[in-house]
Amino acid sequence: MLETTIDFSRYSSVKIGAPLKVSVLENDNEISQEHQIIGLANNLLIAPDVKNLALLGKNYDYICDKGEWVEVGGAANASKIFNYFRANDLEGLEFLGQLPGTLGALVKMNAGMKEFEIKNVLESACVNGEWLEKEALGLDYRSSGFNGVVLRARFKKTHGFREGVLKACKSMRKSHPKLPNFGSCFKNPPNDYAGRLLEGVGLRGYCLKRVGFAKEHANFLVNLGGAEFEEALDLIELAKTRVLQEYGIHLEEEVKILR
């Protein structure tokens, strides 16, 4: 098993973190339950002393036509998958043109934009070497019900790439900030929006040391420059406390915190 050092202050999308050892996994038999897969670190906040980090290597970066479905390796990124579906006139993953991440993380969090999400197109996934049908994965709003590493997945093939869906997803992205961030900080509560709640407690544009909630959209935690893990964690906890006190609603993080 190979090992490398990754500086997460450069590698992660929010540009917060420290140089850490990361195992590079190239075969199914190298996977263990202890591994915390980082992918492209787009939706992660990583503590400076976390252990057992790993990523899937080049053997998992592939897309293959299997006749009735398309098989995608766990390390293939969203852009690569989007381009394949568009080039082959396949519908269902148009939203990946506006999302970051690798296949494994996209399945694990049932990634999506509004009503467009992974589970609508997914057929099955290979988790820790075992193929599971979609129904067994417990996919829900930005979450799943399984433990383990997604090594590959299969998607149904329906012809007819939808340019209108891509256009709608591009429009949604216009409100996203340019500063380093990890996407939505919190999941939307049932029948409400995390951004509305955060704005309601005065956190839109609010700064705490070197982190803040974006002026463009309150549900985006941004790195103002040189921020550290504890600063981001403090702001997340502050937001949860304020929203709970004002609205009686427990906000749940969409960002995955590794510590």
UniProtKB/Swiss-Prot annotation:
EC code: 1.3.1.98
GO biological processes: cell division; cell wall organization; peptidoglycan biosynthetic process; regulation of cell shape
Gene3D superfamilies: 3.30.465.10, UDP-N-acetylenolpyruvoylglucosamine reductase, C-terminal domain
Enzyme class (EC, first level): oxidoreductase
Cofactor: FAD
GO MF term set: flavin adenine dinucleotide binding; UDP-N-acetylmuramate dehydrogenase activity
Reaction catalysed by this enzyme: UDP-N-acetyl-alpha-D-muramate + NADP(+) = UDP-N-acetyl-3-O-(1-carboxyvinyl)-alpha-D-glucosamine + NADPH + H(+)
A Pfam family the protein falls into: MurB_C
Keywords recorded for this protein, A-Z: Cell cycle, Cell division, Cell shape, Cell wall biogenesis/degradation, Cytoplasm, FAD, Flavoprotein, NADP, Oxidoreductase, Peptidoglycan synthesis
Pathway membership, UniProt: Cell wall biogenesis; peptidoglycan biosynthesis
Record keyword Oxidoreductase present: yes
Catalytic residues of the enzyme: R142, S184, E254
Gene Ontology CC annotation, any one: cytosol
Subcellular location: Cytoplasm
NCBIfam families named among the record's database cross-references: murB, PRK13904.1
Family from the record: Belongs to the MurB family.
Function: Cell wall formation.
Protein name: UDP-N-acetylenolpyruvoylglucosamine reductase
Species this protein is from: Helicobacter pylori (strain J99 / ATCC 700824)
Gene: murB
